Amino acid sequence: MNDDGTIRIFYGTQYGYEEEPDFLTNGRLDDEVSMFGRTKEEILGYKDSIMGPIMVVLEDDMLTVKEEPRHIIPYAVKGTSFEEHPFFEGSSMRKVGDKYYFVYSSWQNHELCYAVSDYPDHGFTFGGTIVSNGDVGYKGRSFENKLNMTGTTHGSIECIDGQWYVFYHRLTHKSDYSRQACAEKIYIAADGHIDQVEVTSCGLNDGPLAAKGSYP
């Protein structure tokens, strides 16, 4: 993200949180030792874990890290606004006006969520779910009554010709690895809130595809 001349990169994933504090004691711990060049004791003792949504500032060469990595939302979610929708992966940051919108895939494993802050690296408050690939939560729908096979979704929001959209993927062929790209119109209210939108097959077409001709 080019934030008025400051280059920021957002990354990370989160395997386990308070409910699984010993998650990294399995084979993944050896991977972390190799990746980060630290001892097991250093990794297990790291405040807020080495996992989670992380931001670093880069030099203009886009290669050199300028500052220490920092968590942008809490790793420990109990008692926070993120308790029901902890971060899993898929960090994406957008600036809307003077607010920062952090879009991410949650541990619910079917939704794109967002959080809002005045700052790019702290102060985020959970905003809500933008889209669920099973329409879970849309107009109160329960997970038991989901409308499609659910699984991890990734994506973000973008403004095109004055209209905001959410881009994401849903699953096909009953496989978590068969993913169909989708888009829906969204609306950012004056107070910054984004209502959850329904999954459709219209995408950017502004309506159902005409039943004639051919499509790539």
PLM-predicted stretches and their roles:
Residues 1-216:
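Carbohydrate-active catalytic/glycan-binding domains of CAZyme proteins
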